[in-house]
Amino acid sequence: MSRLSKEEIGKRLLELIKDETKPAIGCTEPVAVAFTVATGKKYMTGEVLKIDLKVSKNILKNGKSVTIPNTEVCGLDIAGALGEICGDSEEGLFVFKNVNKDYLDKAKEMIKNKVVTLNPIENTDPVFVEATLKGEKDEVIAILRGGHTNIEKIIVNGTIAFEKDNKNEKDNKDCDFIKELSLKDIREITEDIGIEKLDFIMDGIEMNKEAAKEGLKREKGLTLGSSLLKLQQEGKLGKDSATIARILTAAGSDLRMGGGMCPIMTSGGSGNQGLCVILPINVVAEDIKASKEKLQRAVFFGHAVNNFVKKYTGKLSAICGCAIAAGIGATAGIAWLLGGKDKEINGAILNMLANLTGMVCDGAKGSCAIKLSTSASEAVISAYLALNDIIVPNNTGIIGNTVEDTINNLGMLCKDGFYKADDVMLSIACKEVI
């Protein structure tokens, strides 16, 4: 356990999960670009004549091929243009809520007239956007770093107009504390936290259930969820909880990646991860008729484990965080929900890591639904296997001596082993941009 008291750890963990579990409309990488531009525009006194965007390679990879809400088009340049035209920075992750056809037409005209430029930038935080807005009299530079709505600095005509006090932010959040915990610590906090503090968990469950429902009805993205449902109705797929989790998670991702306006509750700052953590746990809870309190705690545990894993792998990385980090969170929550103790919870996580480690991130797009659906299904199966004492042995391959060692191994693989792979994937996925 951390040097902090258990009470303080519980308080910080709750703050962290609340901070990283918020509703969003649309993929959070285009959102980050639009939000940065919209924030910068507030400091302009006249018309914006030019927007120069610089983004991290991870923002570029994860934002270039995903449909912007209510548009049927993709592109970070379009996202930036919409941020200038109709973005409201006060709305945070809902910055796209006002998008309509008229605004889209104006954004397309801006792109046609080369008002917006987009370039990747090397050697920066994985979540990084710099937007330079130029007018007749003003030049405003807005810099976002470390989080999808975390504005770090605003420079107006060469003078710093706003700079975030990172020291106070560190003192208040100190998110790295979670790396000092074990999975057992997180599980104990999950069981001890006052249930009245977890009302926001139910909001996320209902929100993502509705997104999955809408995804099954609407022709969005890859339409994987509705296609899987049809196969199930034809008797070609089963009606077990693993298959239902696969279908619903795919449907939610279809909607989100396909530009649906339905809000999604995020996990670790990602809507797809929110779908992958919440929906499989909820499916199992409904199957076994778990109590509302058990469901809330299981989903909270899932969010916490997802954030724990991402402290090792990074917020955006070369591996598919939705399938792996969120999938690990889901299987941990399911194993706990099914009555598993630390052995079974850890075993479910090890089963997932032995299975899906190595699934690369090739950017956010419609086919993310396939990866999410795989992870959702495997999260259910891995938990049930662990409850039946089927657990991969220690010290084999990526699997270390403990579950924490294994997650650390995953982090090493991401940061040391896959760094070059991420560059290669960027060149493949974004060749027309870079």
Curated annotation (Swiss-Prot):
Gene Ontology biological process terms from the UniProt entry: L-cysteine catabolic process to pyruvate
Disulfide linkage: none
Top-rank taxon: Bacteria
InterPro entries reported for this sequence: Ser_deHydtase-like_asu, UPF0597
Molecular function (Gene Ontology), one example: L-cysteine desulfhydrase activity
PANTHER family registered for this protein in UniProt: UPF0597 PROTEIN YHAM
Family designation: Belongs to the UPF0597 family.
Protein name: UPF0597 protein CLK_1462
Organism of provenance: Clostridium botulinum (strain Loch Maree / Type A3)
